[in-house]
From Swiss-Prot:
Protein name: Iron-sulfur cluster assembly protein CyaY
A GO MF label: ferrous iron binding
Classification lineage: Bacteria, Pseudomonadati, Pseudomonadota, Alphaproteobacteria, Rickettsiales
PANTHER family: FRATAXIN, FRATAXIN, MITOCHONDRIAL
NCBIfam families: FeS_CyaY
Family classification: Belongs to the frataxin family.
Name of encoding gene: cyaY
Keyword Ribosomal protein listed: no
UniProt keywords, alphabetically: Iron, Metal-binding
């Protein structure tokens, strides 16, 4: 995947995460702040940070619950080396339902 393709997929994914949280968080318990390619989610558990790392072609997640993760895009999913999927972690920790393939 070239840099342009990566940027498009990563930015679409990050925007999708922000949109899904805003749609499903009926009690407005998660403060969503999307600035460029950095998404901050302020929750009662702490602040999540999701951003794209262009040089590594990864999306990084900093979770106040489970720590830091680096995800690479493969076969339509953002997965880390341990096989964990970005959307699965967010679903579990934020109680928001995400499709595994938003793009």
């Amino acid at each position: 995947m070239n840099n342009s393709e990566f940027s498009k997929i990563a930015e679409t994914t990050i925007a999708y995460i922000a949109e899904k949280i805003e749609e499903q968080d009926k009690e407005a318990s998660i403060d969503v702040d999307l600035q460029g390619d950095i998404l901050n989610l302020d929750t009662d558990k702490g602040v999540y940070v999701i951003n794209k790392q262009s040089a590594a072609k990864e999306i990084w997640l900093s979770s106040p619950v489970s720590g830091p993760y680096h995800f690479f895009y493969e076969q339509g999913k953002w997965t880390n080396r341990a096989g964990l999927e970005l959307m699965a972690i967010l679903t579990e920790e934020l109680n928001i339902k995400f499709d595994t393939r938003p793009t």
